[in-house]
Every structure is written in C-alpha cells, then in structure tokens.
Amino acid sequence: MQLPPVHSVSLSEYFVSGNVIIHETAVIAPGVILEAAPDCQITIEAGVCIGLGSVISAHAGDVKIQEQTAIAPGCLVIGPVTIGATACLGSRSTVFQQDIDAQVLIPPGSLLMNRVADVQTVGASSPTTDSVTEKKSPSTANPIAPIPSPWDNEPPAKGTDSPSDQAKESIARQSRPSTAEAAEQISSNRSPGESTPTAPTVVTTAPLVSEEVQEKPPVVGQVYINQLLLTLFPERRYFSS
C-alpha cells in the first residue's frame, strides 16, 4: 500500500507541554508535538531522532525513548510506551500503549496496540454498567409467579349437570301442581248440579330435544294452566307446549 507523502510544516519549532525531558544530543524536527499529561513524563535520551510532524503523548503512564532510536515522520505514539535502543519506527505508524524491543524495525503504516490495556481502559471508563447490574440482581431473588392457564382446569363432562341446573330443576318440580290436585280444585269450585265433564286422557311423551333445550328452566305454572284449559274447553283440545 502506497502511503501519502508527509506534508511540510510551517512551524520552525516543535511544541512541548508538561513534564518532558530531552537530551541535548537528540534531534527533533519542526512540527513535532511532545505532550505529557499530569503525573506523566516523556523522556528522550541521547541520539534520538524524531521526524517531521510526529506526535508523542504520555497518557496514563510514562513514555521513554531510549538512545539511538529513530522515529520517522508522521508517527503517533501514545503512552505508556517504552521504545528500546536503536529501534526504528516507520513513517505514519501508530503505537498505542505497546512496548517496542531494542533493535526492532517497524515497517511504515503499522499499528501496534496493547489490547489488554485497551480493554482495561474501556472498563474503567464505564462504571455505570456494573452499578446497573448490581441494582438489577436483587430482583432475580423474587421471581414473578407464573399466571395459571385457563386450560389447566378440565371442563365438566357432558353427562353431568352443574349444581345450578339441579337447583333450577328442583324448583320447577316443586312449583308444578299434579293433575289430580288440579282436578280436585276445579271440582270443588263447581256447584253440585253441574255435571263434571270428563277430561280426555292425555298421554305425555318425552320430547326428543337437544341438550341445550333441556338445560333451559321450565316456566313456572305452565302445566297447571294447560290442565285447566283442557278441563274448561275439552272440545278444542287445546295443547300448549
């Protein structure tokens, strides 16, 4: 891969910020930035050569560049980093919290990064995640009780009647007067001279109805009214369902 050329820097001096120690025999090109964060230090030993436009930053640790080290133009070094003696760092390379051994040649455009330090930095910058998980953990001790399913209870069998249907049937039976009682009441209400007409014989058969009709409660006093109409008007043979 062909790297773009390093642009010239208009500044004739390099920039220094923080605790930076530079040996008098070191050579630093214009436009170089040396920046050390609080409680951090940058040490450049004898014979070190830093190319045009490179940036060296000490963050969360010290940066130490040992003697006779060559850093090509356009490099980025973020500490803590230790570069061994007589090592060579190619142009436009990036070093992030990764040490370089002595007499090592790094090709141009390389990326050297300490993944363990990167993970620790990310974990330290997000403490709210641990607090959220700690707050959520007590809720798991008291889980929510499951809602019972309506299909767990089996429906009653078709042949059995519910208690409400049995109560309705018993009330209907008690409210029905018998045929003999209805005849006695009618005969007592007539005078002695009147002849009592004979009531036709009525044969009742159990109607074949569906289960839905049987479940309906009968009308109170319906049988009594039918017997009374048969007695008063035998010629019409009135039947009422």
From Swiss-Prot:
Region (Disordered): 123-206
Function field: Required for carboxysome formation; the N-terminus interacts with CcmM which itself binds RuBisCO (ribulose bisphosphate carboxylase, rbcL-rbcS). May also contact shell protein CcmK to help assemble the carboxysome.
Species this chain originates from: Synechocystis sp. (strain ATCC 27184 / PCC 6803 / Kazusa)
SUPFAM superfamilies tied to this protein: Trimeric LpxA-like enzymes (SSF51161)
GO biological process: carbon fixation; photosynthesis
A GO cellular component annotation in the UniProt record: carboxysome
Organism domain of life: Bacteria
Sequence ranges of Low complexity compositional bias: 196-206
Protein name listed in UniProt: Carboxysome assembly protein CcmN
Compositionally biased residues, Polar residues: 185-195
UniProt subcellular location: Carboxysome
Keyword terms: Bacterial microcompartment, Carbon dioxide fixation, Carboxysome, Photosynthesis
Subunit structure: Interacts with full-length and the N-terminal 249 residues of CcmM; a probable CcmM-CcaA-CcmN complex can also be isolated. Interacts with CcmK.
Family as reported in the entry's similarity comment: Belongs to the CcmN family.
UniProt GO molecular function: structural constituent of carboxysome shell
